[in-house]
Amino acid sequence: MEKKQKVVVVGAGPVGSLAALYAANRGDDVEIYELRSDLRDPTTTPLNFTKSINLALSERGINAMRHAGQPKLIEHVMGATIPMHGRMIHGKRANGDLFEESQNYDVYGRSILAVDRGRLNERLLDILEAMPNVTFFFNHKLTGADFRKNKAWFEVRDKTGAAQGQQSREIEVKFDLMIGTDGAHSAVRYHMMKYTRMDYEQVYIDTMWCEFQIQPKTVVPDAPLDSKFSISPNHLHIWPGKEFMFIAIPSDDGSFTCTLFAPATLYEHLESDRTGSLVPPFFDKYFPGVTTLIPPTELIDSFHRNPHLPLISIKCKPHHYGSSVVILGDAAHAMVPFYGQGMNAGLEDVRILFDILDKHARMDELSACADRAVSREHALAEYTAVRVPDAHAINDLALQNYVEMRASVLSPVYRLRKFLEEALSKYVPSLGWQTKYARVSFGNERYSEVVAKSEHQGKMLVRGIGILSCRVGRALHNE
């Protein structure tokens, strides 16, 4: 009988939890190590986040969960989401009237889903806890690793995050495979760098973010479900400001999780008055209508109480070392949140990794190869070769989409291209034409292929418009 593999997962967020689930379903012994306390404990606040974070869940993330071998997982997750059919652009006309303009994501009516990150994480952890081959180790900090000898060391901490006792207690853990899903400031990646010549690029963009909340409306019993929402629950709401923007994502309790994205200099300006008196006038000027949804006193309180956090973009290569370690999610490719693909890309990492591991395992069975380490090494090398260009592509797309969300959504050129591409997709489907957004959010083709196809479509559109303009000009000249 084949000996079980021991898989150590570092980081118990959604990506790490899904990776643990994939490994456990394949019969491996799985240990999950997490720096924080149990993430299901309401007193545990995720690192770098406030209490409530709503995220966009799209086809890639759904598909990864669909293949996790737990049918009730997808049923539970989908039941707690809100479909967002498109963007709702907010602004003020020249005459002072407020307006809302809906821009659907997709000509076929497909939606992305607003999901509560914490609840998704809780469901994954609950499933894992019921599995006999899964063990949790919360309050454990990775302090060292030897990826040649397949050993790691963890410092045991108390619930406050402090080391236990005057002399911290450290444990040694052996493993066959370590999966690093411990976020942008990954300890696994840090220790992996000691063993492989890793290309690494880290960029902090000149944008900070702060969270706000639109509270649910008070409604009478038996009122329609939508009546608890102050604005449409089926849209991602955007107040574009060219150099900054404000967004709102719905929650199923009727509230909206809102975020102000703005340059650090603007935050410094708003912080300069400790009374907060600069905040409401700023919102009134650039985000019309928000102060009717969030009272000025709440805006000021949230601005001062909630952290002002930077946005980081990380690229690295390779994503593995030998047969012993691989990094997924933000540990491998932290990205800015403007394409709604951070979590989706991380969940997709898991599916692709295990697809490749399974493929190599089947190949070894056919060739009667008994060395799983050799098989794993080949699989991890293929994973890096496949995933790095796609990770870099979605990183770049996320940065580009910030410009689109805060400025281009109001551009006639942007709207014209979107209209033409959607018309071609709907009325001439044989061309295989789709918008870049549809390819990213509603399909599973590689990100790098999406970029290549979008660039090709852009060139074809420019060429087509140029030819049409020449013919129209020639016809007018002949008249």
UniProtKB/Swiss-Prot annotation:
Its cofactor is FAD. Gene3D superfamilies: FAD/NAD(P)-binding domain. This is Kynurenine 3-monooxygenase. HAMAP family: Kynurenine_monooxygenase. It is found in: Mitochondrion outer membrane. One of its GO terms (molecular function) is FAD binding. One of its GO terms (cellular component) is mitochondrial outer membrane. The lineage of its organism: Eukaryota, Fungi, Dikarya, Ascomycota, Pezizomycotina.
